[in-house]
């Protein structure tokens, strides 16, 4: 049986990247929360 996490940089960026966050209202809320918290990196 293979492991469940088979990392792919492209899929990771498309789902969790900055442009993916900016594409939806809720994604922008995520970025706003992370900015307010003072996160060094907003997205992966």
Swiss-Prot record:
Record keyword Transferase present: no
A GO cellular component annotation in the UniProt record: ribonucleoprotein complex
GO molecular function, one term: structural constituent of ribosome
Compositionally biased residues, Basic residues: 1-19
Keyword annotations of the record: Ribonucleoprotein, Ribosomal protein
Domain of life the protein comes from: Bacteria
InterPro entries documented for this protein: Ribosomal_bL34, Ribosomal_bL34_CS
Record region (Disordered): 1-44
Ribosomal protein as UniProt keyword: yes
GO term, biological process aspect, one: translation
HAMAP family per UniProt: Ribosomal_bL34 (MF_00391)
Family recorded in the similarity comment: Belongs to the bacterial ribosomal protein bL34 family.
Entry protein name: Large ribosomal subunit protein bL34
Protein species of origin: Acholeplasma laidlawii (strain PG-8A)
């Amino acid at each position: 049986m293979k492991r469940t996490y088979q990392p792919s940089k492209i899929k990771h960026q498309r789902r969790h990247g900055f442009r993916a966050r900016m594409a939806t209202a809720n994604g922008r809320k995520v970025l706003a929360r992370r900015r307010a918290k003072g996160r060094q990196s907003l997205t992966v």
